[in-house]
Amino acid sequence: ELEVYVKHREAAFEGFSEAAALYTLQTSVTADKPSVLVFQLWFNANLGASDLSYVTRQQIPEISNLQKIRDAILVMPDSEGHLKAFGESVTNTSRRLTPELKPRYLRASLTVLENHPAGEPARELVLHYNDLLDEVKLVAQIDGSDEIGHTKPFGLFIGLRHTSDIEREAGGFARYLVGGSSTGTPYFYPRYPGQRQAPRDDLEEHLGKKLGENFEVQSITFHDTKIQSRTIGEPGWRETPLAYVLLKAKDASVDRIPELQMDLDFYDSLGPVLLPVTTATQIVDARPESAPARPLDGLELMQTLDSRLTGENEGLTLELHATGKGLTPPLDKLVTLDIPDFEITKTDDQGLSIARVESGALGVNAVSERTWLLTLKPTADAGESL
């Protein structure tokens, strides 16, 4: 249970603090060479585990304890020597870290080192990471109004907005659309120790889990790996569309779309590194029973009639199939169902589905389709005209 875990974790942190105090007492009466073992283990534990091989992506550093480590070093007789040794230890350890842990490790180390010269290698790398993240953003955009209601689905566009320079340096971002079963793709994605699956599969899992907390995730449709980035009307910036998520709020209390995250792979002076990019939280209104109609263009409606009528109690079957760029609305919003000499005894809605997603100079669209099967029976006064 979380309560038990927190209790044991705090006890462990207190144990590290006491060990650091005992070490400080020892060094005050000896002239031993500075050792940062206790501080390094304490620091590692703040990242999630004293053995860094057990640290997971989901764990967040305990910033308050990182400051305590710095304070414990500063009260030592040879605080300068210990800060220098700690910085050297951070530099050496960072060469052996997994790509996903390295950025968190180095950022956390600067809370302890601050502006000390021994932290210069870490500062240079963190500055490099910040520069990269200034040039690429993960974006989530609602397809239509943010008044989503709670009875009908709506769509969410997922994409990367980035500078032309970083797109060129990274070799494009379409490689993040490579799935584990993809074949014939021109893109290569690097495999890292501890990486579980292909980038698209990783993103799909994250979207399903994160959005699934408050929404019914009806489908996630990805763009093709051959997609090209598109201009967005901002000089020097482009967009690579990734996916379209079909969602429905679970109830009227839903008030936001949560922060979503995606890992991007780059290289620094030590090797590969994974940097997370996140979307901004978006406020939505799920209270209305009926939300505004979603954008729709290029609507096509096809009718297929099975006119075979072989028995007095049998009816005709009329199939209506609608497609369009956007979300196809319910049948009563599309047509007026007034068929002379027939009554509709049954309407079978096959449901809304996303056939594909398209991207072009004018925008990004989800092409949806919806099929209804109507059972028609002649009215009593239809007479011999049938």
Where do the PLM segments sit?
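Surface-exposed interaction/ligand-binding surfaces
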Residues: 2-386
